[in-house]
């Protein structure tokens, strides 16, 4: 079930003395409950503008926005009341590149600030804040001030504050961009933990494909305000269609570069395949199994392993010798083994 539905959403900024800016153009995305949905693109692609339409920090000029089954926007017009929107926003947490902490208050006071309109007693409020600190591994920093914390610790405080009202959705807008690589990994691991333990749906805005690859299960690629490609992480990463996606991913380009360097020429009754498979599900040597089970000779030209959301995924480039019937049996065998097969020509183009 979709917890966020964006249908044909556009955002246009009107300017008096210059041409209008179309920041988001006709974007449709459906995000399922429990997804970690990565939205990736270069600076200025429209990612941050798009994610702000989910909680109406940015109102669309066209399209529909439905969150948690509640209509926010229809045909570019806000249909939810201000009071109801305020209530719904409490169920949509948000973190940013800048931590936006109150420097003159302690860590626990920063978290409590998000609960100032709650009905909790003082004791309940303190208990909840300590639980949130435990959740983000900062139990010993309750009385510290932001200036006494590292960047990663400050982002953990921001995450705890964003979780204060028990949101169903967390919007992460370039939340790791200001952090060093090791701290970035730690924050991404924390987001993955929150997704797993709380059932939290996360929308991850980033220009770093490695962040998406580490924790997301779905991804959309944006360019010039449009989504040029989207789908399951595995499908998009291992068989990218859009040119921009190929630049981000690099894997498809590696296959093409390999073929160019080898300058291969396929013989009669010889086919070239790209094989993609989960190493968790396919533990056997595919080339040996093809010879043993199908009786065809396969040669490996290229091999690579990517780790996508903790799943090791292998990519092989192989040639298979055999007549049309043998090729048909080969394709069926590979499909039955859970291998995704794409036939290529000698230049790496799909057939």
Swiss-Prot record:
Binding of ATP, residues: 41-48
Main location: membrane
Membrane topology value: Peripheral membrane protein
EC numbers on record: 7.4.2.11
GO cellular component, one term: plasma membrane
Subcellular location per the Swiss-Prot or TrEMBL entry: Cell membrane
One GO molecular-function entry: ABC-type D-methionine transporter activity
Keywords (A to Z) from UniProt: Amino-acid transport, ATP-binding, Cell membrane, Membrane, Nucleotide-binding, Translocase, Transport
Residue ranges of domain ABC transporter in the record: 4-249
InterPro entries cross-referenced by the UniProt entry: AAA+_ATPase, ABC_transporter-like_ATP-bd, ABC_transporter-like_CS, ACT-like_dom_sf, MetN_ABC_transporter-like, NIL_domain, P-loop_NTPase
Family: Belongs to the ABC transporter superfamily. Methionine importer (TC 3.A.1.24) family.
Main function: Part of the ABC transporter complex MetNIQ involved in methionine import. Responsible for energy coupling to the transport system.
Subunit-structure text: The complex is composed of two ATP-binding proteins (MetN), two transmembrane proteins (MetI) and a solute-binding protein (MetQ).
Record's protein name: Methionine import ATP-binding protein MetN
This protein's encoding gene: metN
């Amino acid at each position: 079930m979709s917890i966020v539905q964006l249908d044909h959403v556009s955002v246009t900024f009107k300017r008096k003395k210059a041409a209008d800016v179309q920041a988001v153009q006709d974007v449709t995305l459906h995000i399922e409950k429990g997804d970690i949905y990565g939205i990736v693109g270069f600076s200025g692609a429209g990612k941050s503008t798009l994610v702000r339409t989910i909680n109406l920090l940015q109102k669309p000029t066209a399209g529909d926005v439905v969150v948690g089954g509640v209509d926010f926007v229809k045909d570019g017009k806000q249909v939810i009341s201000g009071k109801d929107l305020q209530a719904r926003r409490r169920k949509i947490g948000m973190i940013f590149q800048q931590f936006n902490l109150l420097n003159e208050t302690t860590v626990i006071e920063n978290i409590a600030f998000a609960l100032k309109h709650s009905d909790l007693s003082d004791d309940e409020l303190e208990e909840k804040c300590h639980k949130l600190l435990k959740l983000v591994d900062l139990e010993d920093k309750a009385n510290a001030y932001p200036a006494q914390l590292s960047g990663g610790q400050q982002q953990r405080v921001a995450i705890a504050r964003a979780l204060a009202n028990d949101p169903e959705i967390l919007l992460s807008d370039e939340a790791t961009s200001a952090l060093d690589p090791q701290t970035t990994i730690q924050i991404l691991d924390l987001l993955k933990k929150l997704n797993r333990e709380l059932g939290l749906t996360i929308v991850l805005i980033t220009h770093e494909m490695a962040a998406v690859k580490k924790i997301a299960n779905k991804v959309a690629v944006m360019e010039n305000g449009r989504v040029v490609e989207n789908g399951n992480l595995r499908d998009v990463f291992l068989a990218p269609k859009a040119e921009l996606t190929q630049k981000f991913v690099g894997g498809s380009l590696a296959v093409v570069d390999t073929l160019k360097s080898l300058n291969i020429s396929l013989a009669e009754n010889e086919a070239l395949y790209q094989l993609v498979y989960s190493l968790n599900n396919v533990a056997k040597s595919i080339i040996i199994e093809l010879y043993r089970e199908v009786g065809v000779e396969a040669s490996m030209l290229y091999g690579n392993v990517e780790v996508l959301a903790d799943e090791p995924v292998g990519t092989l480039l192989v040639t298979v010798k055999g007549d049309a019937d043998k090729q048909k049996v080969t394709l069926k065998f590979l499909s039955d083994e859970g291998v995704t097969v794409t036939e290529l020509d000698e230049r790496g183009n799909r057939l």
